[in-house]
Structure formats: C-alpha cells, structure tokens
Regions:
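Short alpha-helix
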Residues: 198-213
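A short glycine-rich, Lys/Arg-flanked "PGG" loop and its adjoining helix->strand segment in the class I
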Residues: 157-172
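A short SAM/SAH-binding and catalytic strip from SAM-dependent methyltransferases
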Residues: 143-156
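Conserved Class I S-adenosyl-L-methionine
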Residues: 215-297
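Class I SAM-dependent methyltransferase SAM/SAH-binding core
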Residues: 86-133
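Conserved class I S-adenosyl-L-methionine
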Residues: 2-74, 77-85, 170-197
C-alpha cells in the first residue's frame, strides 16, 4: 500500500489517510500463537499508574493541554472528558468546571475518577462505553478533553467528528508523538523476535484533521517524567504481561529493563512518561445555545 505523506496538508486524500491510519493500528495486533501461550491479557491498563499520574498532575497542573483547556473555561463552563482514565485531563480543571461528564470503557477507571472528583466537591456524571458510540448519551459540553485515547480509535474520522460536535468552545486532545507502545518494540524483538510497527503518529492525525477541514493548532512538548510505579517489581510485572510472557520470565524482563536504561529506583511507565507529546486543539461546533447546566459542585 502506498503510504500518504502526513505533511501533505489539506490536499491529502482523506480516504487514503484514514485507510493508512487503520492499517497501521491493525499492525499492532499480537500473533495468536503468542497470546495463546499466556493466560493474562497483554492489553493491561495499570490502574495504579493512572491513579498516581492523575494525583500528580492535579497537585501541580501544568503543560499546554491544561493551559488551553483552562483558558477556554474563562468564564467557567462544563467539561466532557473522553477516555478519562483516573482524571489526569479533567481534575486540574475543576476550579473552573461547572459540570463534569466522564466517559471511559473501564468501570474501574470511572470509579477512580469519581472518587477523586467527589473528594474535591464535584459529583461527575459517569458514562461507561466507547466513544463515539456513547456520544449521544454523554451530550455536549463547553470544553471537551481527550488525552491519550486517539491511538485506540481505528475509525478515527467519526471519533474526531463526535469530539467536535460535542464541544461548544474547544476540543483539546493530547497524544504522544508516536504510538505509546513503540517503546516496547526492542523488548518484543528481544523476547519474541517480532518486529513491531512504528506508526501511526501525531503528524498523521494532524493531516487527517486538515483533510477533514478542521483548522487545528498544535504544540509539541515533553511531558515530565514521574514516579508512575510504586516499585520496580510493579513495572516489571506490567511489562511482562504486556509482552505476553509467563510469570517465570519476570527476572528476564527485569534484566531487559535495566539493560534499556531503566533505573530501578525510579521506575517510569514505558508508555508516555517523559516522552514527547503533542497538544492539539480546535474550535468546537456544538450549538451556541448550549446550557452549561446547573453546577454539580
């Protein structure tokens, strides 16, 4: 398949861009003979990592994604967080948030967010499900945030369209410059002899937005690293599961992590911690008569 040039801009053929995005994401499928050899799902979501990260960014909000959403909430307004996790995107916005709706596929993640929001005096409306399937249920908001979800969306055009339609003021997307699991590629080669994909990328998403006629701004920056894991053993276990390796290979995984430069005293997630990320924002096209609703604070 001919690969479209992500830098081609609005003239790039949207159909080709969308097909390339789908094909690249499909390339991340793990061969059945590898997944069949283990009992645990490799698509693990380390909930404690999400919780620690949400707590850290809530304590000291910073970065372009926060700044764009914060500015759009002047005057205060409602927030819809798509793929909320434990709340790293929306919790820092609570001081200017009049109503919070949170969408996630994982009930455990919604519970983590609700616990933290309610501790701050906000009762969120929780919408379990996949975006954009639950877009109608989630409704509209002044600001829509969506952090580190786009690489899960094979059908990216309706995903982006629904974000735009849901926002009265602004959509703010945050994503890593390249697929977050790229950092595991050397380990897949080491343990399975498997060459993993390198795409898609944030540049490709920007090209898709342009081809859709959406004028988006973007800013690249490095997200500060932090102590995402409580211990090196926890990082080792999550990495082992992600690599479809049995428990008796934990020592081998630990050795590989150390060989890669991971400091056991400061275990960080191999996904997006300390990595270059891109904040992307564009105007929503939700109805101008959107009511921000009664405060749920």
């Amino acid at each position: 398949m001919t690969q479209p040039d992500p830098a081609a801009g609005p003239e790039a053929d949207l159909t080709d861009l969308l097909e390339h995005w789908r094909a690249e994401l499909a390339g991340w499928a793990i061969p059945e003979q590898i997944t069949a050899a283990v009992d645990e799902s490799p698509w693990v979501l380390p909930r404690t990592v999400f919780a620690r990260r949400a707590d850290r960014v809530s304590a000291a909000p910073s970065g372009p994604s926060f700044e764009r959403a914060w500015a759009a909430l002047d005057p205060p307004g409602s927030v819809l967080d798509v793929g909320c996790g434990a709340g790293a995107a929306c919790l820092p916005l609570l001081p200017r948030c009049t109503a919070l709706t949170a969408v996630d596929t994982e009930a455990d993640m919604l519970a983590l967010l609700a616990e933290r929001a309610e501790a701050s005096g906000t009762r969120p409306r929780l919408v379990p499900g996949t975006w954009p399937d639950v877009a109608a249920t989630a409704g509209m908001a002044d600001v829509v945030t969506c952090h580190h979800v786009t690489y899960n969306a094979a059908r990216i055009e309706p995903f982006l369209t629904a974000l735009t339609d849901a926002a009265s003021r602004l959509v703010v997307v945050e994503m890593t410059s390249s697929h977050p699991l790229v950092s595991l590629n050397p380990f897949w080669l080491r343990f399975h002899g498997l060459v993993r994909p390198s795409g898609p990328t944030a540049d490709e998403l920007l090209a898709i937005l342009a081809a859709m006629g959406i004028s988006a701004g973007h800013q690249r920056w490095n997200r500060p690293g932090g102590r995402d894991y409580g211990s090196f053993a926890e990082l080792t276990n999550v990495t082992r599961i992600r690599l479809c390796l049995p428990p008796d290979r934990a020592d081998d995984v630990a050795a590989a992590l150390i060989d890669s430069g991971i400091d056991p005293a400061h275990p960080v997630d191999l996904g997006s911690s300390g990595r270059e990320v891109v904040t992307i924002w564009w105007d929503g096209r939700g109805g101008n008569d959107l009511a921000t609703g009664a405060s749920n604070r």
